[in-house]
């Protein structure tokens, strides 16, 4: 049985070399006339048809696009891997700085610490003597004025109550246990400080110091930091621990004498 010749085109090395040279020279999609000229020229080196030339250029362009696509994908993957490595290397280095920034206290001269008038805080301490250990928003201001401002004494000292001379040491100690150690703060103040203290001096001194700190003149600072009428009232200290006897013995003796007189009658 005779074998039919194959219709598949098998290009010779000379034909492939000529086609590749033409492709490198810039020929990508030849028209019909160019295909006929190329086919006639390549027919000297072997069997070839016009459709073989057309499909060779089409397949060669497709292979080149695939190669370019693979190169671009490999380049993008390499760049992405490098970016990931840089991000992972920079994350541990920046985490201590961020934690230190979060835990760092605000600067002493920064605007984050509110400036509260010491006289207003004195009035707050007078009405809330046991809230000082929980909220102290004016620590930054007091830290700056510690060298010039006289420390605010306890509300009991503002009323010039002489606890040591009044014979109420035992009663103050007992009340200190009930009020969370308040008597310990009272006993820490010396008797000389209690006697020298004047209730009007802290107000004037605070106005002068705050006026100087704000950079204004004496008159401008006093006018700017003038307190309302409720804060200019003199402080009053409640008589929590009475210093005088209640006269129970006299009342008992008088009641006994009256009962005896009624019984004799």
From Swiss-Prot:
The UniProt entry, under SMART domains, shows: HOX (SM00389)
Q: Which Pfam families match?
A: Homeodomain
- List the protein's name: WUSCHEL-related homeobox 3B
Functional summary from the UniProt entry: Probable transcription factor required to initiate organ founder cells in a lateral domain of shoot meristems. Involved in leaf formation.
Q: Give expression by tissue.
A: Predominantly expressed in tissues enriched for shoot meristems and young lateral organ primordia. First expressed in lateral domains of shoot meristems. It is then expressed in the margins of young lateral organ primordia. Not expressed in roots, seedling leaves or fully expanded coleoptiles. Also expressed in vegetative shoot apices (five leaf primordia and the SAM) and in the male inflorescence. Expressed at high level in the female inflorescence.
Species: Zea mays (Maize)
Q: Which GO terms describe its cellular component?
A: nucleus
Primary location: nucleus
The record's GO molecular-function terms, alphabetically, read: DNA binding; DNA-binding transcription factor activity
């Amino acid at each position: 049985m005779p074998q039919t010749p194959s219709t598949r085109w098998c290009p010779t090395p000379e034909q492939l070399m000529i086609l590749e040279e033409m492709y490198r020279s810039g020929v990508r999609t030849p028209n019909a006339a160019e295909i006929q000229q190329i086919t006639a020229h390549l027919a000297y080196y072997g069997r070839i048809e016009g459709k073989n030339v057309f499909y060779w250029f089409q397949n060669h362009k497709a292979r080149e696009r695939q190669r370019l696509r693979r190169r671009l994908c490999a380049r993008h993957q390499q760049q992405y891997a490098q970016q990931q490595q840089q991000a992972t290397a920079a994350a541990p280095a920046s985490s201590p700085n961020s934690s230190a920034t979060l835990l760092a206290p605000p600067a002493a001269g920064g605007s984050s610490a509110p400036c509260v008038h010491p006289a207003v805080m004195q009035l707050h301490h007078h009405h809330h003597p046991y809230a000082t250990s929980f909220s102290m928003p004016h620590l930054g201001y007091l830290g700056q004025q510690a060298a010039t401002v006289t420390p605010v004494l306890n509300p009991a000292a503002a009323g010039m109550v002489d606890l040591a001379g009044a014979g109420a040491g035992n009663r103050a100690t007992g009340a200190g246990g009930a009020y969370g150690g308040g008597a310990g703060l009272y006993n820490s103040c010396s008797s000389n400080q209690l006697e020298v203290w004047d209730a009007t001096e802290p107000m004037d001194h605070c106005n002068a110091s705050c006026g100087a700190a704000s950079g204004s003149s004496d008159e401008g600072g006093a006018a700017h930091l003038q307190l309302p009428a409720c804060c200019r009232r003199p402080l009053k200290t409640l008589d929590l621990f009475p210093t005088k006897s209640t006269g129970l013995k006299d009342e008992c003796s008088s009641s006994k004498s009256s009962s005896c007189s009624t019984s004799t009658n």
